[in-house]
């Protein structure tokens, strides 16, 4: 009673004793009739009156809270047999815990329902008593009890959770209510949904009690995504159980599997009929899918095996097909559903090479209208009127190209320019257009009417294709686009065309400066492409600097006061890339020329300040980004369209920010990290270039070489003049660097903040000291080089003299040898003449005798061969005689046979002669 007395004292302090005395006395009389009445009907009438007055009056709720709870709790404990009294007591409790409608309550009144909830939940026995009532057979008793527990949960969540955990079979009783009548089931479902939020112990018990089976059973019974708000509550409860709980996800995957979740996404019946509740149900199911895909937020990237297993199993169960049907092929799906679908597709393939390959192989459409899924998503990006859908679909390509060199190369290989259409063709007219052709068509669209929205979106996709892939960057640099009107212009490289579009967007922005339609993002996205393209690509820098107008335009953009902080910062980064990735030695296009142009246009301090302004902007500063916590959808039969589409851009924006909030999604952590790393490299490189101005080309070897026909005296004089010229140039550079340092110092004094002042001073000191030190080193090196060259030339002159003497000696030796040869030749000619004149005739052999000897030898050999032939003929003749005798014995006419043989021989001889 001490607690009740103190509570009553608070009421008196708030409302005054006189104002609340009437309510207090009336409530007290009713409580006396209920607790001390002898007639049952009188007691029942009193509790009905108490119930009515408590439900309608805030003052009555306050008065009831002071003394009514002990009476009502006593009824629930001791009068269970009197069903009407128990019902009345529960309804009275519910009325005391339910806030009065704000339209009827005064704004100055204290929330009595909140105070009553606090008073009732302080005693854990009261919660245990209410949980025991769930086992009663009466429908209304169980129904009102669940409503009371829900009201307590809304106002005293922590106490109720602790009391339920300490009550034996507390969670079990609530889970049993899911199998009760529909009305009770729905109330129990709503109670469990609120109870399991951020309560890990309760989540484990609920899962152990078979929550997954019961949830999917209710969803199936209600008709899946076509069901009412009960399906939303089931999915909300499911999400509470799976969120940040790898063990529950593994249990679901290994027991029931993911098929029940995936089946919710299957469109049934009339596909274009999307009610608001169906939209909310689909969004809740997609949120479940997203939680399974993303895993725990505190897990290191690449080490969440549960996340990878979930992604693999989901794709094996054809989830990708359902997502593509819902997000791409279903033209009537709400924008919010399509956006969430694209996010799930992107998360599904993020860091999963196999899933990326499966997506790349998917085709959509029917019959002759079939095209790759990636082409269909690109078509949506270029055509959709929703910025949210563009951002979501762009995320698919971001995750597809991230660390996927083969995928990027595959997409870049299709970048083949098509002939410029004679009429304004729409992208949807040709489904057989390749990915690259469609992307190039999107990049070039809008040039005639100045609408660069499509070009901007295509530029975002191209930035993913060329990111961290030098091969794709070089491939894109070789693309040359035709002019829309050949008679009005010449073909130009794709890179320069995009720079020209950036200039067009800048001029359009300046013309529409007074317009209040939305925020800027076209220039930022094009600049993002150029920054990404130029990283580690000297060829792209050279292509950019091939036109002097590009550097001039970029300098104007950096100093343009009408441009946003983000635009000026990104333009400064692109300008810095033209320094750190510049490999040119051509005057006017080298790194020194770019740095010199920056110094003359704005000065180093002003240039570096653009980096600091950008890093402190809304887009690049993590501290200024809105927290992305979990926000459940409102449980109403008809959620508002604004809530479904999540159009909360005004809440996300900071006052004074000129950049579009959608850039928060497009400028992801990897790009912001790239910009920050480039900023540091640019600072170091610019200081280095200023410290060593044109050091690579200052000493020209050709000027140090002795010209032909130049004597040593003239050569030495020319070397002295060259050294004097170099010294003069060094002095000029030192004076110029001193002026720059003074400019940095004076600019640093005008900085408002002490931090900026220190940074400017640091840069100034570093530039000045480093430049002087480097210049002195360069001067000393150049003087040493000239001295070394002079010594080398003198050495070469001495060497040449020695060589000339040697050559003269060799020439004399050759002359002597030539004279010797002439003498030998003369002697030989004299010998020939003497031979021709008959002197000392030579003795020749007797040829006729030799011929006679040879003839005799040949005749002798012929006679020997003839004798051998005669011997052979004799032998053959004896064989013929023997054969003839044998034939005669056999009765053959030998003479006739020999004649025939002779005739045949003659005929054969004649034929050979012919």
Curated annotation (Swiss-Prot):
- So which residues are the signal peptide here? none
**GO cellular component assignments:** cytosol; Golgi apparatus; Golgi membrane; Golgi stack
The GO biological-process annotations, alphabetized, read as: post-embryonic development; protein exit from endoplasmic reticulum; vesicle fusion with Golgi apparatus
Keyword Methyltransferase tagged? no
Does the keyword Coiled coil belong to this entry? yes
Task of the protein: Golgi matrix protein playing a role in tethering of vesicles to Golgi membranes and in maintaining the overall structure of the Golgi apparatus. Functions in the anterograde transport of storage protein precursors from the endoplasmic reticulum (ER) to the Golgi complex.
| PANTHER family named among the record's database cross-references | GENERAL VESICULAR TRANSPORT FACTOR P115 (PTHR10013:SF0)
Q: Can you name this protein? A: Golgin candidate 6
> Which gene name does the record give?
GC6
